[in-house]
Amino acid sequence: MNQTVKVKKKKKTITLGVVHIRASFNNTIVTFTDIQGNTISSASAGGNGFKGARKATPYAAQVTIDRASEKAKEYGLKTISIRIGGPGAQRESAMRALFGQNFVVTSILDVSSIAHNGVRPPKRRRV
């Protein structure tokens, strides 16, 4: 009888990383990357079971941070730099959830894009 031996794939350990938080009006997307920008883990409020208007709530952002950080901690991530962007109301709760995950935060950077009157906004909604 031939026996096959499964070789376990080694997970690379990453101690320093960047957290990208995109808080839009409709959803929250969280991505953990290494310094070069390679994705370690990512999660979104819609992918965590929140649908419709509940995706844009602060609680959904908190759950999203928790799920993404659990996956990132499996790689040994300890020190993070935070890049947060977007106009959403869930920015503060996402930050608080990150501070509760016992990461060492080196910097917080706001990367929200600011329009210089480039694109015409959509027409007013009539209900």
Curated annotation (Swiss-Prot):
Disulfide pattern: none
Function, as annotated: Located on the platform of the 30S subunit, it bridges several disparate RNA helices of the 16S rRNA. Forms part of the Shine-Dalgarno cleft in the 70S ribosome.
Gene: rpsK
GO molecular function: rRNA binding; structural constituent of ribosome
GO CC entries: ribonucleoprotein complex; ribosome
Alphabetic keyword roster: Ribonucleoprotein, Ribosomal protein, RNA-binding, rRNA-binding
Subunit structure: Part of the 30S ribosomal subunit. Interacts with proteins S7 and S18. Binds to IF-3.
BP GO terms, sorted: translation
Protein name stated in the entry: Small ribosomal subunit protein uS11
